[in-house]
Amino acid sequence: MDRYGEKQQQQQMFASYVDASLLAASGEVQGERPRARRRRRRGARCVGGGGGGGEVDGGDPKKRRLSDEQVEMLELSFREERKLETGRKVHLASELGLDPKQVAVWFQNRRARHKSKLLEEEFSKLKHAHDAAILHKCHLENEVLRLKERLVVAEEEVRRLRSAAGSHTASGEGGDIMGLGGSGACVAGSPSSSFSTGTCQPPSFGGGGGGGDHLGDDDLVYVPEYGGYADNSVVEWFSLYGLI
């Protein structure tokens, strides 16, 4: 029993020791992490501000601002060549006292600005042409409306002239019919066709002392006998005027 109790005590002591060591290790790790971060931040501050802002900007040629003369020389080179070769780039950078990579970046940005400018000019031209096309379309639409109005007026005038011509023709035909009825003429078709006695007037033969016209021998009409006519209407016509 004593041995069993000693083993339990040893196990408890070992477990407590292991737990304490683990807790200590975790505490050390948790305490070292913020210290490492602080050291890194301090180191970064020292690197950024140890030499001063003027020394960093002035000492590093990549971060130096370009002077007016350098910009002018780069612009002249860009007008001659849009994209520089490696040898030309290195030579120009050595002449201007710049880094070849900085010259390459400047040319890349300058090409992008040049392309944007060309796109803006092209857009301006297209917009101007679009506005002109819209204005021309409006003029054409107004012209179409005016032509439609003129067409309506012309159609009304044509209808008016046609109605006037129709009424004039009808009145002229009525006058001709009245003139024929007043002259005493008789219009007849074939001898077998029927006719109205009201439209024809008998000719006046000269009687005794009537003052009428006297017919000569040449004016006499030879009328055959009654039995020679097959149509009774002709016979009636001749008998009506006393020719039989």
Swiss-Prot record:
Cysteines paired by S-S bonds: none
Feature: compositional bias, Gly residues: 46-56
Record carries keyword S-adenosyl-L-methionine: no
Protein's gene: HOX14
Residues of the DNA-binding region: 59-118
Name of the molecule in the record: Homeobox-leucine zipper protein HOX14
GO molecular function: DNA-binding transcription factor activity, RNA polymerase II-specific; sequence-specific DNA binding
Region feature (Disordered): 25-64
Coarse class of the protein's main subcellular location: nucleus
